[in-house]
Amino acid sequence: MFKGILLCVLFAVLSANPLSQPEGFADEERDVRGLASLLGKALKAGLKIGTHFLGGAPQQREANDERRFADGQQDYTGWMDFGRRDGQQDYTGWMDFGRRDDEDDVNERDVRGFGSFLGKALKAALKIGANALGGAPQQREANDERRFADGQQDYTGWMDFGRRNGEDD
């Protein structure tokens, strides 16, 4: 579920830049419909990937539970049986407290790797957004310093609303 949420956030960040561009009304309506279908497809793909990483589709997990119950491996009396400490798992979902095995360690490594991938993707998306808004902060500061040195701007603060083109009122 964590990975699915991260994928949804990634798609939202990546789609935020095109949504902020001004366009005509008819084009906007057509684009919104196209973007909605694209976002729907992306979310479905993200959910498929998320369920794959989290142990398969719900029907597959239910079939696995039924097989465990039929084989006598699982005492399926309830999903909140905290007292059991044998090797079998009662419930493989989010209420599985305190149990760790090799599979959990592998999943944590996958999450860390996926998290670093999302971190890099987020940095790239922020860089694209900064470039669309006028460059990186350091670049904007350098541009402001150049304008101040050339006498084009009296740089007294970033909220100087009263002046137009460097003239005093």
Swiss-Prot record:
Signal sequence annotation: 1-26
Superkingdom field: Eukaryota
Any one biological process term the GO annotation gives: digestion
PROSITE patterns: GASTRIN
Residues that bear Sulfotyrosine: Y76, Y91, Y155
Family, per entry: Belongs to the gastrin/cholecystokinin family.
Function: The pharmacological activities of caerulein are quite similar to the physiological activities of gastrin and related peptides.
InterPro entries on file: CCK-like, Gastrin/CCK, Gastrin/cholecystokinin_CS
Gene Ontology annotations for the cellular component aspect, listed alphabetically: axon; extracellular space
Keywords: Amidation, Amphibian defense peptide, Cleavage on pair of basic residues, Repeat, Secreted, Signal, Sulfation
Keyword Repeat tagged: yes
Name by which UniProt lists this protein: Preprocaerulein type-3
Tissue occurrence: Expressed by the skin glands.
Lineage of origin: Eukaryota, Metazoa, Chordata, Craniata, Vertebrata
Gene Ontology MF annotations: neuropeptide hormone activity
Ranges where the record places region Disordered: 135-169
Subcellular location, record wording: Secreted
Sequence positions bearing Phenylalanine amide: F82, F97, F161
Propeptide segments, given as residue ranges: 27-72, 86-87, 101-151, 165-169
